[in-house]
Amino acid sequence: MMWFDPANPEVLFGDQRSETVTVTDRSHRTDGTRTLRIEPDALLDFRALPFADGAFKLIAFDPPHLTRAGPRSWMAAKYGKLGPDWRADLRQGFAECFRVLATDGVLVFKWNETQVKVREVLALTPHQPLFGQVSGRGGLTHWLVFMKPRAA
């Protein structure tokens, strides 16, 4: 989804699902559908990453950001949806990212604050971003960059 070259051997794309879904949306296709393919290299849960401490120098963390979505929502089908314990899930996700991140490693975090403000999410981790960029329609998508400190 964010990768320019999903076949790059230096990249490991993980998701908790592997599926192909056809959804109805306002696409420009004549039949009004869109086919989504979620094809991760590894099935995993960001709350319990199956990697050794310090295994990665760079991590891109792009968790689901929707708390509400209809049963046929293409956004939920594409990006996933947060569960009722989303605060605990994201807190654990940040902890796991920093656990498997090498010292001085970089975490790139992407968040869209249409439903949950980025400040609420940042309150779930003791780490502060070094810098970031706001993008997207309405300036709601945040790209934040963290670096794992030596003492973390």
Where are the model-predicted features located?
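Class I S-adenosyl-L-methionine-dependent methyltransferase catalytic core
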Residues: M1-A152
